[in-house]
Swiss-Prot record:
It comes from Clostridium botulinum (strain Alaska E43 / Type E3). It holds the Pfam family MMR_HSR1. GO terms for biological process: division septum assembly. Necessary for normal cell division and for the maintenance of normal septation. This is Probable GTP-binding protein EngB. Residues 22-195 form the EngB-type G domain. GTP binds at residues 30-37, 57-61, 75-78, 142-145, 174-176. GO terms for molecular function: GTP binding; metal ion binding. The keyword Lipid biosynthesis does not apply. The gene is engB.
Length: 198
């Protein structure tokens, strides 16, 4: 599958702002600065589709991107940034929870973790949350270009053990810098929910 067209549609906070055209949705979620915007830009081959912020925790909205005029890629607010006030964290948490608990169009959640570090308590909570709501969950370990060849197995084991993944849970490494395996990752994340396949 190729992503030939990608378009920003709307930023939303409340359910009444979500798109209402009943297209399938695949949501991306992860800690602030895990490389979520870079990953979205890399997969869509658009340098500025998702804004890459130098300030962690700046994205507070749910952003909907229409892919191939067919389905939505949904960018959820980054979590876990220490310098944000508790009330702001609570607001973001509510925004994410409302979307996850009331969205029939949502078919899969892609949880991003940093391949160089052990998943945080927030990562564990987010993964468990996604599972709790019954969604198909895929783990993508970002920034894999920073790992030496010998470190991949150790990184995967640490992430799998920390999140308590089963053998059947889907796990992939990816680097937005070298873009190795972009087409394969696109297929694994989106193919079964696309209706217009090329």
């Amino acid at each position: 599958m190729r992503i030939k067209q990608s378009e920003f549609i709307i930023s939303a906070v409340k359910p009444h702002q979500y798109p209402i055209d009943n297209r399938n949705e695949v949501a991306f979620v992860g800690r602030s600065n895990v490389g979520k915007s870079s990953l979205i830009n890399s997969l869509t081959n658009r340098k500025k589709l998702a804004k890459v912020s130098g300030t962690p925790g700046k994205t507070r909205l749910i952003n909907f991107f229409l892919i191939n005029n067919d389905f939505y890629l949904v960018d959820l607010p980054g979590y876990g940034y220490a310098k944000v006030s508790k009330s702001e964290k609570d607001t973001w948490g509510k925004t994410i929870e409302t979307y996850l608990s009331h969205r029939e169009e949502l078919k899969r959640i892609v949880c991003l973790v940093d391949s160089r570090h052990k998943p945080t308590g927030d990562d564990i909570m987010m993964y468990e949350w996604a599972k709790h709501f019954g969604y198909d969950v895929v783990i993508v370990a970002t920034k894999s270009d920073k790992l030496k060849n010998a470190e991949f197995k150790k990184s995967e084991k640490l992430i799998r053990d920390t999140l308590k993944l089963t053998k059947d849970d889907k796990f992939y490494f990816y680097s937005s810098l070298n873009k190795k395996g972009t087409e394969e990752l696109i297929d694994k994340l989106f193919l079964e929910f696309a209706t217009d396949i090329d």
